[in-house]
Every structure is written in structure tokens, then in C-alpha cells.
């Protein structure tokens, strides 16, 4: 299994246990799901049994996003201006990291990241933002949105901002 770890904070952000796809050569997207957790049990979202009708949440149970929950991601807030400021600084940090560790990928990163940032800014109100467990303000912000069906959530992380650790 591969774990995608933030190169700045070391936070684990995603794993290949989810169906990870590369987009624009710069971003990994993975569909996720809403699951019910509580009392030590995790409901993977299977249909309720026909006899019981609709299952009600048990005491202490809550519905959470499985990626956000599994990797202990923390919600954060941005307006468009503050996100633009953050993303410019983050892109500079990743570009410096790549110049030192993988100089051949700088151009591909710049091209793909620019295209994806434009996509995010174009539909800014639809996005949710999460930091890694350490809440490092210089590290990657995980992006969350919904597919065209309006019900399937997905997360997006920057390919060049993570290292893949095989476990």
C-alpha cells in the first residue's frame, strides 16, 4: 500500500486504498464516501436492510467523510483572496522543494498546477479545505469537492507536494 505524505509537514494525507487518479499531471484525485462512525464501529455505507427500513444513527454515532476521518484532516477556511495568497506561497515552497529534489519535474508542476488552480478559483464556492493533522500553515491544504452527480465527494492533493511511502 502507498501512503501519500506531505513533503513539508510529514502528515499522511491519502493512500492508494482509495481509487487515486492523476489529473492535469499535477493533482491526485480520489473519490471518497460519507460513513457512519461511533461506538467503535464504522458503517461503510451499505444499504440498510429491507426489514429495518431506514437505519437511524445510534447514540454517539456521526456521519463523516472517510478520507477526512481516516487521515485526521482538520477543516480550515479560506475566502478567495486568502486562498490565492496561500496557494501562491505554497507553490513557491513546492517549486523550491522540486528544484532541490527533482529539478526535471518543475516545468510539469508549474503547468499542471496553474491549470488546476484556475479550476479551483473558477468554482471556489464549491470547495472545502482541510489541513493535515499537524495543522502546519505552510503545508498542503487538501481540497474537497463533489463530482458532477452532486453526491460523490472527492479529495484532491498536489502530486508534487507529496512523497509516496510504501508500507
UniProtKB/Swiss-Prot annotation:
It comes from Candida albicans (strain SC5314 / ATCC MYA-2876) (Yeast). It is found in: Cytoplasm, Cytoskeleton. PANTHER family: TRANSLATIONALLY CONTROLLED TUMOR PROTEIN-RELATED, TRANSLATIONALLY-CONTROLLED TUMOR PROTEIN. The keyword Nucleotidyltransferase does not apply. Belongs to the TCTP family. It comes from the Eukaryota. Residues 1-167 form the TCTP domain. Signal peptide: none annotated. Involved in protein synthesis. Involved in microtubule stabilization. This is Translationally-controlled tumor protein homolog. GO terms for molecular function: calcium ion binding. GO terms for biological process: cytoplasmic translation; negative regulation of autophagy; negative regulation of microtubule depolymerization. SUPFAM superfamilies: Mss4-like. The keyword Hydrolase does not apply. Keywords: Cytoplasm, Cytoskeleton, Microtubule, Protein biosynthesis. GO terms for cellular component: cytoplasm; cytosol; fungal biofilm matrix; microtubule; mitochondrion.
Amino acid at each position: 500500500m502507498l501512503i501519500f505524505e506531505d513533503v513539508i509537514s510529514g502528515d499522511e494525507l491519502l493512500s492508494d486504498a482509495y481509487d487515486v487518479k492523476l489529473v492535469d499531471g499535477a493533482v491526485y484525485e480520489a473519490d471518497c464516501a460519507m460513513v457512519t462512525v461511533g461506538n467503535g464501529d464504522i458503517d461503510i455505507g451499505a444499504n440498510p436492510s429491507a426489514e429495518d427500513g431506514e437505519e437511524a444513527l445510534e447514540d454517539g454515532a456521526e456521519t463523516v467523510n472517510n478520507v477526512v476521518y481516516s487521515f485526521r484532516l482538520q477543516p480550515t477556511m479560506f475566502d478567495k483572496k486568502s486562498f490565492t495568497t496561500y496557494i501562491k506561497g505554497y507553490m513557491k515552497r513546492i517549486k523550491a522543494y522540486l528544484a532541490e529534489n527533482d529539478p526535471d519535474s518543475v516545468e510539469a508542476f508549474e503547468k499542471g498546477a496553474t491549470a488546476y488552480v484556475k479550476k479551483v478559483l473558477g468554482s471556489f464556492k464549491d470547495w472545502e479545505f482541510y489541513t493535515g493533522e499537524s495543522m502546519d500553515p505552510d503545508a498542503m491544504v487538501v481540497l474537497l469537492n463533489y463530482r458532477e452527480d452532486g453526491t460523490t465527494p472527492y479529495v484532491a492533493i498536489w502530486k508534487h507536494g507529496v512523497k509516496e511511502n510504501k508500507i
